């Protein structure tokens, strides 16, 4: 019997890196709302009293970026200098240029149309916005077909934020982190080993008599009651440093794109390295990673495997992927090559087809920027749909 421990973490919406992600995606949404064909690549850096926004944008609309920044930060909960940051009074600097015409050329007129003479299919006209490799993953450990460690870490982080916002534990502040360690036997989750919760809090809050008991009662225990695995002997560590009064941008500078493992599968699956937030769907870093999750989830939903990881790769300016790889880690009901062939029959992985099939030219991205881009049953993400599972099964059967 092979036993191992696996750990994943999540962070709340008030973590400085997540503030940056949400600001970048809020700016993206504001542009897509009025001009769905906007090209956007926006990075945010946030530190004590300051927010810096930079990037490249081509759009027909006007967005008051400073107002978008302030509104998002205030919604997160940083609305007072007593909390270490105030969205209403912080400094906001903006440095935005236009998208490089060299990049635009490859996206607007793909290599297939420009060089290879393929003009009959409109989907061949849009090239990938960059080269790169993207991964998607799904497994049957949870109803949402996500790995249990990251799924539970996200649930705890969402609840930590919820009890702050609804006043149940009103002395909490927006910055927080959760971490979950699960024991596996023969590849299956069997026991919760350790939970770590760190939360920023108001001054003069006693850890042992107030904070730790409140976190246990209102955050941790309600989630553990829903688990189907053993919690016997589990450890709970709350604010292990002893104090967490200084948090958010005052405690650490935040940057867009620094929580790519939290955004995806908690380290349980491979990652191509590209961040998501602040990027419109012409950037395959984002859209193709969403598509790979869609593919992998449909493979598992179809019962073709209990674990599935899919890699796709693109060349900048080309519409068709240059590589596709399906791996089921020995859990496939048929050979991986057969599943891969079925994927190519059922899914069109050209960038324009992904944007069309997943309806990505919409202002939907700010809600993805905290608590994970995948496995969100409370949100209606198109890449979480399993409506192509039957088609995959039929394609495998031939």
Swiss-Prot record:
Binding site for K(+): 43
Binding site residues for L-methionine: 56, 99, 252, 283
Pathway participation: Amino-acid biosynthesis; S-adenosyl-L-methionine biosynthesis; S-adenosyl-L-methionine from L-methionine: step 1/1
Catalytic activity: L-methionine + ATP + H2O = S-adenosyl-L-methionine + phosphate + diphosphate
Residues involved in ATP binding: 15, 175-177, 243-244, 252, 258-259, 275, 279
Main location: cytoplasm
Keyword Endoplasmic reticulum: no
Region (Flexible loop): 99-109
Cellular compartment(s): Cytoplasm
Coiled coil region boundaries: none
Residue numbers binding Mg(2+): 17
InterPro entries registered for this protein in UniProt: ADOMET_SYNTHASE_CS, S-AdoMet_synt_C, S-AdoMet_synt_central, S-AdoMet_synt_N, S-AdoMet_synthetase, S-AdoMet_synthetase_sfam
Co-factor remark: Binds 2 divalent ions per subunit.
Cofactors, names only: Mg(2+); K(+)
Superkingdom of the source species: Bacteria
Any one Gene Ontology cellular component term annotated for this protein: cytoplasm
A GO term for molecular function: methionine adenosyltransferase activity
Gene Ontology biological process terms, A to Z: one-carbon metabolic process; S-adenosylmethionine biosynthetic process
EC number(s) on file: 2.5.1.6
Physiological role: Catalyzes the formation of S-adenosylmethionine (AdoMet) from methionine and ATP. The overall synthetic reaction is composed of two sequential steps, AdoMet formation and the subsequent tripolyphosphate hydrolysis which occurs prior to release of AdoMet from the enzyme.
NCBIfam families from the UniProt entry: metK
Subunit structure: Homotetramer; dimer of dimers.
Protein name in UniProt: S-adenosylmethionine synthase
Species the sequence originates in: Parafrankia sp. (strain EAN1pec)
């Amino acid at each position: 019997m092979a036993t191992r421990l696996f750990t994943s973490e999540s962070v709340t919406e008030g973590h400085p890196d997540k503030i940056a992600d949400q600001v970048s995606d809020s700016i993206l949404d504001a542009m897509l709302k009025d001009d769905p064909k906007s090209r956007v690549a926006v990075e945010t850096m946030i530190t004590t009293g300051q927010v810096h926004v930079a990037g490249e944008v081509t759009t027909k609309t006007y967005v008051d970026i400073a107002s978008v920044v302030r509104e998002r930060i205030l919604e997160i909960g940083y609305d007072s200098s007593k909390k270490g940051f105030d969205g209403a009074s912080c400094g906001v600097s903006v440095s935005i240029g236009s998208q490089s015409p060299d990049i635009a050329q490859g996206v607007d007129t793909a290599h297939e149309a420009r060089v290879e003479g393929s003009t009959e299919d409109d989907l061949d006209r849009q090239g990938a916005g960059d080269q790169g490799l993207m991964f998607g993953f799904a497994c049957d450990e949870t109803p949402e077909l996500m790995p249990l460690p990251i799924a539970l870490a996200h649930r705890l982080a969402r609840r930590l934020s919820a009890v702050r916002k609804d006043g149940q534990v009103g002395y909490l502040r927006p910055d927080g982190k959760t971490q979950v360690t699960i024991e596996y036997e023969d590849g299956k989750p069997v026991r919760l080993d350790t939970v770590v919760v760190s939360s920023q809090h108001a001054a003069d809050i006693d850890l042992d008599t107030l904070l730790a008991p409140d976190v246990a009662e209102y955050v941790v225990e309600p989630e553990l009651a829903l688990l189907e695995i053993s919690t016997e002997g589990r450890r709970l560590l709350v604010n292990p440093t002893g104090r967490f009064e200084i948090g958010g941008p005052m405690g650490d500078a935040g940057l867009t794109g620094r929580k790519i493992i939290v955004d995806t599968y908690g380290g349980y699956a491979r990652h191509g390295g590209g961040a998501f937030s602040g990027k419109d769907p012409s950037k395959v870093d984002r859209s193709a990673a969403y598509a790979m999750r869609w593919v992998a989830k449909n493979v598992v939903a179809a019962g073709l495997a209990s674990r599935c990881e899919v890699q796709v790769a693109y060349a900048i300016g080309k519409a068709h992927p240059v590589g596709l790889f399906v791996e089921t880690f020995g859990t496939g009901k048929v050979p991986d090559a057969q599943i891969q062939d079925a994927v190519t029959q059922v899914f069109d992985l050209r960038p324009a087809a992904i944007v069309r099939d997943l309806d990505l030219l919409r202002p939907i991205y700010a809600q993805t920027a905290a608590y994970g881009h995948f496995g969100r049953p409370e949100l209606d993400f198109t890449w979480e749909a399993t409506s192509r599972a039957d088609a995959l099964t039929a394609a495998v059967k031939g």
